[in-house]
């Protein structure tokens, strides 16, 4: 009887471990009604807002949804509405990002989403507070402008973790991004 009980207990524990492993790999579909987008993420994002300043000094809000996984793997979606009287430049935005993070642009290409123009780029960066001090991070990003709203998706990870599995995770994330109710420009 003890052997039977032990076998059943082992089977139940094994089954629960398998189920918990499967659930930890499931992604959620996050929808932002205010941001007018949806995206798949590995967990519910943390939402924040910060004030930014345009080149002409005008202040405007930027909204951010982010998920950080163990190992410093981060998924971020930011958006803001273009400041009235300004013209958005994807190239200037890219250059500003590279400069702000003291990074090196590795690659870039033109992309589009639902007819809206965009840029995809990859940057290598060494954060000021990186541990160890020689840690290098990879920033894969997609930038879109749609109906005077700018979206920036980023997938950030330590370069030491670069792998096919992580690349597949980035593709899953980026390819899941969808715009809500917008009309083509």
Where are these regions (language model features)?
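Short acidic/polar N-terminal linker immediately downstream of export determinants
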Residues: 24-34, 52
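Boundary at the C-terminal end of the N-terminal hydrophobic targeting segment
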Residues: 18-22
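A short acidic-to-branched-hydrophobic micro-motif
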Residues: 62-91, 152-154
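Solvent-exposed coil/turn segments that connect beta secondary-structure elements
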Residues: 35, 70, 80-82, 126, ...
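Bacterial N-terminal signal peptides
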Residues: 7-16
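Signature of long, low-cysteine stretches enriched in small and polar/charged residues
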Residues: 40-66, 94-146
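Surface-exposed amphipathic alpha-helical segments
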Residues: 33, 37, 42-47, 91-105, ...
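Positively charged n-region of N-terminal signal peptides that target proteins for export
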Residues: 1-4
